[in-house]
Amino acid sequence: MNTMALYLIGDIQGCDNALQRLLEKISFSPSRDTLYLLGDLVNRGPDPLAVLRRLMRLGASAHCLLGNHDLHLLAVAHGVRPAHQHDTLDGILQSADRPSLLAWLCQQRLAIFDNFRGEDILMVHAGVLPAWTATQTVALAGEVEAILRGPDLADFLHHMYGNEPSAWDGSLHGIDRLRVIVNALTRLRFCTPDGRMEFKHHGGVETAPPGYLPWFDAPGRRTADVTVAFGHWSRLGWLEHPHLLALDTGCVWGGHLSAIRLDDSVPNRPHHLIQVQCEACQTPEI
């Protein structure tokens, strides 16, 4: 008899065929197994509508994080942002079940922290600021999640975008506070050693601007004692370091859609990586 399995999956970005093939490869059973998805469920891939419908049908078997593309969908749907040239969101926006899909999306998380067979894992889409603990990260994510599920959603989306403030300060309040939280959890790649973020550079770790470094290399990072799992950074690719799992392997760019099984891991041994090849749907930006 097969036992329950827990899987962590990287950025799907609307590639439903790849998701279906990955679920078949792991013999996923929604009545038995559980998925944790690291955000960017939609956009740029050919069928984000099918992705949302599939994940929504899975109910409690799928725990989804929100990425920057998922928040972009909400902003476009509420008339806050124009669609971008390479967006593939029309199917969702024109679907009869648009209201239920968007309502479901607003119920998803920005951070998850749990223990899997003795391993504490913090899941985010993009990154964590060095001053934040895992527990604090989940609490701060909860502040944004409450807004996404409340009556002030549209107003929040109108003010969510922007690069400032670029650093965390516990005294921040209002939209400045919420914007820093969103930017860290859904957009962060590089920061200064003391946690000042920048968003112009999207390449690999070697493209860090002077004075900046990958967020996970910040000295004194307070989540260094837990495993942080994240997506978002396709130029980074699959990365497994002590207490670090990067799972955006560029599915939409013709890379792979990746999963690891969490419940069969052995402490201090590599996780087993499971992948399916993806068809390129977009050309990577240079």
Where are the regions that the model predicts?
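Residue-level marker for buried hydrophobic side chains located in beta-strands
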Residues: 8, 37, 64-65, 122, ...
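Acidic, His/Gly-rich catalytic cores of divalent-metal-dependent hydrolytic chemistry
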Residues: 138-286
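A short acidic-Thr-Gly-centered motif at the start of a beta-strand
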Residues: 1-2, 27, 55-57, 112-117, ...
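Divalent metal-coordination and catalytic microenvironments
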Residues: 11, 40, 67-68, 105, ...
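Active-site environment of divalent metal-dependent phosphoester hydrolases
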Residues: 15-17, 43-45, 69-76, 131, ...
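Active-site-proximal beta-strand elements of phosphoester/diester hydrolases
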Residues: 5-13, 121-127, 246-247
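N-terminal active-site segment of His-dependent metallophosphoesterases
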Residues: 1-58, 71
